[in-house]
């Protein structure tokens, strides 16, 4: 069986649809074979991307080295439907097309968080720090959050856990609406900017996520940037709001962020990126769902596992530094089987 590769001109066409990582935050450490796997492309096609202007450096041994986030954006914007980021988004958003009740019903998950140590997928499980190896720390589930119940695993007494973990967790969603006009105003400001393409929804490097106002001013945002910005604006309006971060659960776990706001004593979730993606639909390779987009303003979903963070901080660290995006390849979840 052969794997169809993306057409070279299609990959090249993605280059003017996103903004590459600023030089001061870019990490040029992804080689051509890794890039080719992520893009389902031949090495020669990756070389053409470099020739066409995709930023890179040339290592005397490894050859051209790219920024992984730039590659993810090439994959997301090429429109082939075959690349790793396209397939991942399509799979993880598939539940938006499911019946409304399925978004909220209690759902039991078996979760494994064992971050990949390399872009090729070497897992952190069982690895100990020392002897020159990376020290891996991960954020644990927030068991105090509404709708989160630990069934097996733990204890998770500290916010950070050495190496990885496994757990069984029940997530229960909740359908909520929002009435406060201040919330609606801040929400519209963020979502409308994405919908009007004044700000491009794309992968953003972690150092730029930490400087979310700069990212927004540059005209780029992902879930972390949008959620932090939304939380800032809600707090400025006098509301209690926090940017949350955790995992969107599916065959593999995806790092995701959203905003939590308190209205009438009830914690309500605001997910501007989910709302945007569900609105544009086929443009991003997922089902268009106005009903799901509307539910993103207030409702809590049973596929989002919040972790213990103060303001959507990174979920995985290598040697005390935020891990690259490819570390998420070692995070997985599946529905728990009944005993």
Language-model-detected regions and their locations in the chain:
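Conserved beta-strand edge residues that scaffold enzyme active sites
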Residues: 63, 247-248
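Residues that mark the N-terminal boundary/hinge immediately upstream of a DNA-recognition element
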Residues: 31-32, 67
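Cysteine-centered nucleophilic/redox motifs
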Residues: 216-244, 259
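Secondary-structure boundary elements
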Residues: 136-221, 229, 294-337
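Short helix-start
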Residues: 56-79
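Short alpha-helical "recognition helix" segments of helix-turn-helix
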Residues: 34-37
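Major-groove DNA-recognition helix of helix-turn-helix-type DNA-binding domains
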Residues: 41-61
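His-Asp-centered catalytic microenvironments across diverse enzyme cores
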Residues: 3-30, 41, 84, 88-139, ...
């Amino acid at each position: 069986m052969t794997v169809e590769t993306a057409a070279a001109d299609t990959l090249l066409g993605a280059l003017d649809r996103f903004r590459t990582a600023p030089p001061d935050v870019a990490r040029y450490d992804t080689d051509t074979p890794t890039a080719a796997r992520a893009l389902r492309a031949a090495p020669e096609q990756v070389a053409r991307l470099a020739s066409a202007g995709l930023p890179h450096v040339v290592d005397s041994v490894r050859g051209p080295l790219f920024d992984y986030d730039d590659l993810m954006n090439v994959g997301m914007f090429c429109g082939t439907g075959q690349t790793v980021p396209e397939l991942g988004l399509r799979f993880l958003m598939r539940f938006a097309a499911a019946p409304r009740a399925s978004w909220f019903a209690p759902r039991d998950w078996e979760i494994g968080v064992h971050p990949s140590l390399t872009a090729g997928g070497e897992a952190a499980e069982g690895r100990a720090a020392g002897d020159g190896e990376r020290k891996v720390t991960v954020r644990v589930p927030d068991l105090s959050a509404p709708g989160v119940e630990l069934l097996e695993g733990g204890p998770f007494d500290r916010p950070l856990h050495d190496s990885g973990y496994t757990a069984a967790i029940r997530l229960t969603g909740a359908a909520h609406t929002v009435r406060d006009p201040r919330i609606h105003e801040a929400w519209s400001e963020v979502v409308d900017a994405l919908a009007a393409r004044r700000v491009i929804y794309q992968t953003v490097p972690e150092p730029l996520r930490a400087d979310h106002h700069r990212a927004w001013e540059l005209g780029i945002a992902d879930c972390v940037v949008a959620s932090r910005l939304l939380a800032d604006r809600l707090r400025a309006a006098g509301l209690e709001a926090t940017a949350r971060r955790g995992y969107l659960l599916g065959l593999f776990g995806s790092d995701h962020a959203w905003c939590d706001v308190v209205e009438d004593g009830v914690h309500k979730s605001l997910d501007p990126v989910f709302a945007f993606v569900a609105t544009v639909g086929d443009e991003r390779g997922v089902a268009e769902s106005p009903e799901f987009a509307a539910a993103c303003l207030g409702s809590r979903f049973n596929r989002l596992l919040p972790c213990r963070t103060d303001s959507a901080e990174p979920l995985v660290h290598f040697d005390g530094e935020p891990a690259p995006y490819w570390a998420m390849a070692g995070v997985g979840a599946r529905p728990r089987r009944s005993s």
